[in-house]
Amino acid sequence: MTALAAVPDLQDAAGPSTTTVHSPNYSGSPADISSSPTTRAVSRNTARQTASAPPNHAESSPPGNASPTGPPSPSGNNVSPHGRHQGMSKLRACLVIATLSGVSFLNTMGSGILTVSLPTMARDVRLDDSLLLWPASVYSLAAGCTLLVFGAVGHIIGPKRVWITGACLYAAFTLGVGRSATGSQLIAFRSVLGVSIAMCLPTAVSLTTNGFGAGRWRNMAFAFQGMGQPLGYSTGLILGGIFTDTVGWRFGFYISGGINAVLAICALVVLPSPPRHDEGDGEQREVEEEATDATVAAAAVNRSSRSRPLISRLAHDVDWTGTLAISASMGFLSYVFSVVSKDYDRMAAPQNIALLVAAALLLPTFTLWVGRQERLDRPALIPNSLWRKAAFSSTCAAVFFTWAVFNAFQYFSALYFERIEHITALQTSLRFLPMVLVGAATNIVTGYLVETVEVRWLVVVSAIFSLFSPLIMALVRPGWGYWKGAFFAMLLSPLHPDVLFTVSNLIISRVYDGRSQSLAGAVFNAVSQVGNSVGLGLTAVVSSAVARSYHGSGGVGNAMDPPTGRPQHLPSSPTVEATLAGYHAAFWLMFGAAALVTVITFLGLRRGGKVGAVE
């Protein structure tokens, strides 16, 4: 909170500022709102029917979750040069950021508790060994399959409603996890938690961009949300280890659920309501004053769309076919790679092959469908024209590979500490503390630097530093000790992911117009979620294959057996060497992917500009 309160908030001494519309022009030059592909996809057919009609200002009453007394929209004189509403106090702005970042923190805190406590949890709820990893897997699967759905729904009914609903459900079912008496209850509650967090993650982007104008406050809001993830996971690891050995693992979920309930109540009061219907994204009104044909048509589209009943808008203003097609493809991919990460022999199972084929076929189907939607001027989830923008396409590719590497790096590092160095889960969690501290500092510094430093150099330099993390772990030997090897890998690993989190949210949110920010958040989170699953699955296949070939068929087992929370005294030195060889191979694969990210961002962000600067 202290760091947030220190954000400068200078008054605009030069008079009224000119605020332009978010656009895919990343160098910061102004662009008309009609340049947004998402706006164009919805506009022309409806505009033909409504542009000639006189404006009906009676239709501009606030929606259900809008408040006439809420903070003004981020336009013109209502926003300070650093992006904070002049009608919003610093305390309230800090509470908004803390609330949104808090759920991001609790999301990964639960995963950290689960990672350390899973063996004890499985014993207490009598979870079958064949289902041991399902409490973790179903959470990711449920979230990955519904992120885009709730991003689209939040675009229509309002991000604040969807976010608060998700936060309330997350609080309730986190407590449910703590009260689970059977394995089936544990898996079911974790599934609902995945759906609940899918309501919060994409809409948090919309609440951030609509709640803060372009500038330092928006940058810091994204930075603190990024900081919440590593802090939450590491806190979960530490608390999970402590609680499991003392008062019991259930206490960790009770604490998490209680904090979440407080955040949900706080959100009702402090979160900004969406702009009024006739204001669009809050920045459109200034553009409309220019009275160009395009902006008049866009305004007419907005009035016509908002005047229809909610059910009609949900039915016609959401690309349901595209949403379901890409969500199913991501769900199939995530499921198969989740299964394969536990036992790569299951890749040959007929049902997994069928799901992979279905996922592969759905991708070109989705591309053809959204292309058709664009040609017919209908809503398209991710218009194909966006992929022709180097900043957008390279950012999505970087997010995919970065989250694939970072997720796999954390998991394999934990395996290395427990299975090769034979230390406890609590000792393992303490070895991740440098990652947490550096990650927190990186997010705060990035929130300031995105205003003044070219995004290309921020991302590329951080990628080069983080490149050394998997390289060190690919070479490390148990005899090195923690301080000569793994310590430096932990220090460097969060630099690039935490820089990219802030930068990518700023870039992707600029591609979508202000009314579609929930979709922007859904795109980012969906890409990162698939990256998590694919990265862990592929590294698991490589690790297990190398371990088996190293030791023949004589007893290595699966190199991806999950941490048990206890020291793993392996039966023989050859087995340890085989397992270590598998881990090294996985880290080499991560190194290759991280190097690819460096090249992608260097080439793709040449015209990235300063994405955090006030336009």
Curated annotation (Swiss-Prot):
Residues 16-53 have a biased composition (Polar residues). It holds the Pfam family MFS_1. It is a multi-pass membrane protein. InterPro entries: MFS, MFS_dom, MFS_trans_sf. Residues 1-85 are annotated as: Disordered. GO terms for molecular function: transmembrane transporter activity. The keyword Transport applies. The chain crosses the membrane at residues 94-114, 138-158, 162-182, 192-212, 222-242, 251-271, 320-340, 351-371, 397-417, 432-452, 455-475, 488-508, 522-542, 585-605. GO terms for cellular component: membrane. Gene3D superfamilies: MFS general substrate transporter like domains (1.20.1250.20). It comes from the Eukaryota. Glycans are attached at N25, N302. It is found in: Membrane. Keywords: Glycoprotein, Membrane, Transmembrane, Transmembrane helix, Transport. MFS-type transporter; part of the gene cluster that mediates the biosynthesis of pyriculol and pyriculariol, two heptaketides that induce lesion formation upon application on rice leaves but are dispensable for pathogenicity. With the ABC transporter ABC7, is most likely responsible for pyriculol and pyriculariol secretion and thereby may contribute to intrinsic resistance. Belongs to the major facilitator superfamily. EmrB family. This is MFS-type transporter 1. The gene is MFS1.
